[in-house]
């Protein structure tokens, strides 16, 4: 399964002007591949991620997720595809203060339809996979920033997505915790064979990405390929 973006263009009105946020962008990310998109604020990274997540419709171009062209889908159809195939790791974990780590996973919509036993087993396995084995019953205030981001990642994986979209995962973390999170994302990408796009302004730890592309003024250019 893969994510294929072809000739994407996104514009926004700005008074009498039209601003181009994404300008003829083409990108393919295959299963088991981590692609890092770097660039300064305002370069179009967030708009690109929103289009890839089917949260924003492009002016033109194609978004294909797991072989499904999203252009012909209704809003409800895009929502169903997103729920089934896309995991999103937001910059801020936005965890519920009253819930433990395992309860954060159990509260995810993806867990519905499974038995309670299956849900708890799956949640425990996800938390173990992100390095939080033994911390399932801790609440957000009992976890470090890096640990909260790990819960965020586990929650995004709860639907067994084929595509994982990650927005600035290291923004609020120090150097060491940021490195650990990027290493974890690379490991999860390989083990779960997901197509991962990580948007970041942080140019550290990029050696863990399979490919690094730069976004400036809405356009992409290849920087390097590590594998």
Where are the language model's segments positioned?
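Short coil-to-helix segment of the ABC ATPase nucleotide-binding domain corresponding to the Q-loop/switch region
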Residues: 99-107
């Amino acid at each position: 399964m893969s994510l294929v973006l072809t000739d994407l263009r996104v514009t926004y009105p700005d008074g009498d002007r039209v601003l181009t946020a994404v300008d003829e962008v083409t990108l393919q990310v295959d299963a088991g591949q981590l692609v890092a998109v770097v660039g300064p604020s305002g370069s179009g990274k967030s708009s690109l991620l929103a289009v890839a997540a089917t949260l924003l419709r492009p002016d033109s171009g194609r978004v294909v997720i797991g072989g499904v062209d999203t252009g012909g889908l209704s809003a409800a159809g895009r929502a169903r595809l997103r729920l089934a195939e896309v995991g999103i790791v937001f910059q801020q974990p936005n965890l519920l203060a009253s819930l433990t780590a395992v309860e954060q996973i159990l509260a995810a919509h993806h867990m519905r339809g499974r038995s309670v036993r299956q849900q708890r087993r799956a949640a425990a396995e996800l938390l173990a996979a992100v390095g939080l084995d033994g911390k399932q019953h801790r609440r957000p205030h009992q976890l470090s920033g890096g640990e909260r981001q790990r819960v965020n990642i586990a929650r995004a994986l709860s639907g067994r997505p084929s595509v994982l979209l990650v927005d600035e995962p290291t923004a609020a973390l120090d150097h060491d915790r940021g490195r650990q999170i990027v290493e974890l994302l690379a490991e999860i990408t390989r083990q779960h064979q997901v197509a991962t796009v990580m948007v970041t302004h942080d140019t550290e730890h990029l050696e863990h990405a399979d490919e690094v592309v730069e976004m400036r003024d809405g356009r992409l250019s290849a920087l390097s390929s590590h594998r």
